[in-house]
């Protein structure tokens, strides 16, 4: 009877979630100075269920972005869309023209890498 009383008074543990669990599923949008050239990278897609979209690539590593290296461009994170916007500069077009055509709602504030 004593064991039953102890079990009844033991505090039930709630399952804990990883702090980044709510942040899963970020996408990466890669833009160049040419507004017609872009690549979208989306998370968590198996090869047999990939959509047949032009310029779409998929990564699957727990749906978490571990790191990104960009040379010759900028990176900004849009929290509303959970999207990393990578702006590459290839020297063939002006940065201002491609940024205006690609996404007028995004501010040009970004971290230069």
Curated annotation (Swiss-Prot):
Residues 1-22, 90-113 are annotated as: Disordered. Residues 90-99 have a biased composition (Basic and acidic residues). Induction: A member of the dormancy regulon. Induced in response to reduced oxygen tension (hypoxia) and low levels of nitric oxide (NO). Residues 100-113 have a biased composition (Low complexity). It comes from the Bacteria. This is Uncharacterized protein MT0599. It comes from Mycobacterium tuberculosis (strain CDC 1551 / Oshkosh).
């Amino acid at each position: 009877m004593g064991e039953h009383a102890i079990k009844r008074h033991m505090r039930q543990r709630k399952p804990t979630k990883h702090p980044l669990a709510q942040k899963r599923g970020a996408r990466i949008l890669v833009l160049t100075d040419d507004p017609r050239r872009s690549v979208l990278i989306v998370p968590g897609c198996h090869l047999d269920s990939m959509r047949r979209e032009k310029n779409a690539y998929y990564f699957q590593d727990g749906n978490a972005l571990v790191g990104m290296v960009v040379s010759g461009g900028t990176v900004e994170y849009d929290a509303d869309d959970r999207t990393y916007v990578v702006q590459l500069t290839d020297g063939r077009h002006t940065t201002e023209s491609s940024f205006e055509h690609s996404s007028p709602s995004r501010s040009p504030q970004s971290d230069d890498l």
